[in-house]
UniProtKB/Swiss-Prot annotation:
Similarity field: Belongs to the phosphoglycerate kinase family.
Domain of life: Bacteria
Disulfide links within the chain: none
A single MF term (Gene Ontology): ATP binding
Pfam family, one: PGK
Catalytic reaction equation(s): (2R)-3-phosphoglycerate + ATP = (2R)-3-phospho-glyceroyl phosphate + ADP
Gene3D superfamilies referenced in this protein's UniProt entry, alphabetically: Phosphoglycerate kinase, N-terminal domain
InterPro entries documented for this protein: Phosphoglycerate_kinase, Phosphoglycerate_kinase_CS, Phosphoglycerate_kinase_N, Phosphoglycerate_kinase_sf
Residues noted as binding substrate in the record, renumbered to the chain: D21, F22, N23, R36, H59, L60, G61, R62, R118, R151
Record pathway: Carbohydrate degradation; glycolysis; pyruvate from D-glyceraldehyde 3-phosphate: step 2/5
Name of the featured protein: Phosphoglycerate kinase
Residues the record lists as binding ATP: K201, E323, G350, G351, D352, S353
Amino acid sequence: MNKKSVKDIDVKGKVVFCRVDFNVPMKDGKVTDDTRIRAALPTIEYLTGQGAKVLLASHLGRPKGQVTEELRLTPVAKRLQELLGQEVKKADEAYGDNVKKQISDLKDGDVLVLENVRFYPGEEKNDPELSKAFADLADVYVNDAFGAAHRAHASTAGIAAYLPAVSGFLMQKELEVLGKAISNPDRPFTAIIGGAKVKDKIGVIESLLDKVDNLIIGGGLAYTFVKALGHEVGKSLLEEDKVDLAKSFMDRAKEKGVNFLIPTDVLVADDFSNDANTSIVPISEIPSDLEALDIGTETREKYADVIKNSKLVVWNGPMGVFEIDAFAKGTKAIAEALAEAKDTYSVIGGGDSAAAVEKFGLADQMSHISTGGGASLEFMEGKELPGVTALNDK
């Protein structure tokens, strides 16, 4: 991925339109998790340090193309000000004459947070008019929003047609780490694919079968594979229309010499709660009236063993319903195995896996936590990311 970065251009005295990913959780008008804001700090601090006038653009939530008061970026700007230790100004719109007036008052090194770009219907449609209106505000475009790189929107892709366009440090690191994992991995290379649905992970499983030494399956999608082996799955999540596909994946893994691991035992429950009665059974003995909601003890140990003997592990998707403690042990076992495997480079593919390592207090022991769930998945599938394609080549 040879794209220009902020270090390849001169930004002193220039107005920089920097697309960041400030789509953070909020409660009662306060930011409850500032991880994504912190992740953008190196780029913002570099730009201010170089004497740029920095405009920060982001989406927040899904306002559906109209102004939604509780989705304004004001609390985000406030939190950013605390983290940066300098005044952060806030605009009430994302473009237009009022914003231009605010920009003309900026000094070198100042920061102005623009309003939620998804307040405008043209953002998600990648409308050229809106892209141009954004571009008219600035001299340079920087994209540091890896989490939105798989979207062809006005502020992530369209704007790049009208300005010099480069990546920020976060975007650059994501592309380097994930790019190496896909094109030149250290071996043994293990991928762990969890989550609820096979249909969401078809592309990534297909792509990884050509690259990995071990492919570990967990989460709700595992039961379609269990069914493909000829076992009944009780009330567990099952995609009947994907059973043949699951079988073909296992056959293809065998042909390629890939070690394809699915659970050998599972935790079954009579209720979707912490008070449920649970027991651990082999996959051949899942009772018809119960639901499997996590991997079993034997499976946990087997998976941990594979992890410890790997040089590179990419993890995307939990092993069970980890939000409920009764069904979190499998996911926790994976996180702990990664934390303990000191010679293993661990890449956590955003989304639920990132939330899980946070929940278990193990985030700082992972080598790289991706800031983009959907984007990292599409990147690993080998798809082009519009937000990356739009940037200038070196």
